[in-house]
């Protein structure tokens, strides 16, 4: 059966997008897991290691492990466990496959919306190949972002169908896909607002006899009301997410610092989109840095200026103001006003928002097409090819940094300088792989650089725990005492001190630290290097010390 020309072109474009993704991302088949979240999500997660069972499906819908509620993401990991066992390449190739599907759905959504092959292909290729999206694909733990995008674009397609047909079935599918996206990652709470924007973009490319402003005024109810009913779901899932993430929320950051960081982060995201170099795993939030205050005014002026430009061009190029609103709005859940963790911003957060910024490129290409020159089609094709090839080359390099936990953490530290989180992740990897000389050299150098006493204590306690397991009890005792002197006082540090002194035969010191360990607070952090079986260790030490101090009867 011969396909229609439009269908043939659509298939060709989707195949081109898929192939373009495969070229830089095929290397992940040889990559390994990292010790930054992959351990908690995958290879050290007891439920995932059991595989797909009814009990684990129930667990997926009730757990808030990893400070998130995303049951569909957990189920996808369980399925991968059944398919690939513990082979990292399988999980990562599935990420690539999901990313291919998301990019093709993005192409179909924008093709449906704009009827412009140029617009759809340009935006989809930017989404598919932009190096800032590598983190979402080459990091097994970020499956949630890709799944969310797949159902996000499916919701856009069904909603566009609803715009055209007013079909209850199409609207019902939109609701279902929206719920599935929320089950994957709660960042999609902004989808209802995005549906309003996609409705406006649809009007731009499907004009009638009315001017666009007049049409928007007359049909505002048809734009707002269908999306508003979905906002109820957004509100509910926002509450669920806030509850799940409460354990990871950073309440020590003042609201003023969070607002400042949010403004500066918008500026940084713009820079990451248009000049994606020096990308890192973790960008530390340094609220005490006085330079942040100096950067606030330029960031605010930039956002204001770009907003004014977009509004001034709204009559001639409404795509620009729609794209700008897409970017600003979809960033809100992750911009840092509610601070979760210690990062100032993250590559992975730009996965959906960058689509709004991508609108500028098809607009530029359309302007090239309006030039009265005979080679304008060749000029557009050449420009699009240059854009795609440059992104592909940058992505190829960025993917290579993710070959293992050591590679990505070292690269991240090279970009940002000393940063606590990658150092801890690297410590876990070095310990798990027996690279102790590198571990101790790294910890000694970074303990000297760390300004935060609590973080210094964590690094010193990590070192002490590894030394203790190696049988180097004196060095372990020295290291954990440094941690205690820096204020890192909790059950873990006191127990480690007690165990080390017991092995050294210093019973009085062991008794002293054991008594403190029994009443000290629990350590509220997930770290495999600080998560030894405390209760069993303390009970064992209690019995050993009791044997030592109980006098033997005279015979």
Residue ranges of each PLM-predicted region?
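C-terminal luminal/periplasmic domains and tails of membrane-associated envelope-modifying transferases
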Residues: 2-3, 406-555
């Amino acid at each position: 059966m011969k396909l229609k020309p439009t269908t043939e072109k659509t298939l060709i474009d989707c195949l081109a997008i898929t192939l373009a993704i495969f070229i830089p991302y095929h290397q992940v088949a040889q990559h390994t897991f990292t010790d930054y979240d992959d351990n908690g999500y995958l290879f050290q997660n007891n439920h995932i290691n059991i595989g797909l069972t009814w009990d684990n499906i129930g667990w997926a819908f009730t757990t808030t492990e990893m400070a998130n509620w995303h049951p569909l993401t957990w189920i996808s990991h369980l399925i991968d466990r059944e398919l690939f066992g513990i082979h990292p390449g399988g999980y990562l190739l599935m990420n690539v496959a999901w990313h291919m599907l998301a990019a093709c759905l993005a192409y179909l959504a924008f093709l449906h919306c704009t009827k412009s092959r140029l617009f759809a292909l340009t935006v989809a290729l930017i989404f598919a190949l932009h190096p800032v999206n590598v983190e979402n694909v080459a990091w097994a733990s970020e499956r949630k972002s890709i799944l969310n995008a797949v159902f996000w674009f499916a919701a856009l397609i069904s909603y566009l169908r609803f715009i055209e047909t007013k079909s209850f079935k199409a609207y019902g599918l939109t609701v279902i896909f929206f719920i599935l996206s929320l089950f994957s990652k709660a960042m999609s709470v902004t989808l209802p607002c995005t549906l309003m924007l996609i409705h406006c973009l649809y009007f731009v490319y499907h004009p009638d006899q009315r001017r666009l402003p007049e049409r928007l005024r007359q049909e505002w109810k048809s734009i707002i009301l269908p999306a508003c009913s979905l906002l109820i779901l957004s509100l509910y899932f926002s509450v669920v997410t806030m509850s799940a993430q409460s354990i990871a929320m950073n309440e020590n950051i003042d609201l003023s610092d969070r607002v400042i960081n949010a403004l500066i982060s918008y500026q940084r995201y713009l820079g990451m989109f248009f000049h994606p170099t020096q990308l890192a795993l973790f960008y530390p939030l340094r609220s005490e840095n006085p330079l942040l205050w100096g950067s606030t005014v330029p960031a605010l002026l930039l956002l204001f200026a770009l907003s004014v430009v977009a509004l001034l061009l709204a009559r001639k190029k409404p795509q620009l103001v729609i794209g700008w609103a897409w970017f600003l709005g979809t960033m809100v859940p992750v911009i840092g006003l509610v601070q979760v963790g210690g990062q100032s911003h993250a590559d992975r957060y730009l996965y959906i928002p960058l689509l709004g910024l991508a609108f500028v490129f098809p607009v530029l290409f359309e302007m090239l097409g309006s030039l009265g020159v005979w080679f304008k089609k060749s000029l557009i094709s050449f420009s699009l090819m240059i854009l795609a090839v440059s992104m592909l080359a940058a992505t190829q390099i960025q993917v290579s940094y993710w070959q293992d936990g050591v590679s990505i953490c070292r690269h991240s530290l090279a970009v940002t300088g000393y940063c606590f989180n990658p150092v801890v992740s690297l410590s876990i990897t070095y310990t798990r792989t027996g690279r102790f000389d590198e571990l101790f050299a790294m910890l000694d150098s970074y303990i000297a650089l760390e300004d935060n006493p609590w973080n210094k204590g964590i690094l010193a306690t990590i070192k002490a725990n590894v030394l203790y397991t190696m049988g180097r009890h004196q060095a372990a005792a020295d290291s954990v005492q440094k941690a205690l002197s820096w204020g890192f006082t909790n059950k873990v540090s006191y127990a480690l001190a007690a165990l080390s002194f017991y092995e050294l035969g210093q019973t009085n010191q062991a008794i002293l630290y054991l008594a403190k360990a029994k009443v000290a607070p629990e350590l509220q952090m997930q770290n495999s290097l600080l998560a030894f079986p405390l209760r069993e260790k303390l009970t064992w030490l209690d019995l050993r010390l009791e044997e030592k101090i109980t006098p033997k009867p005279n015979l």
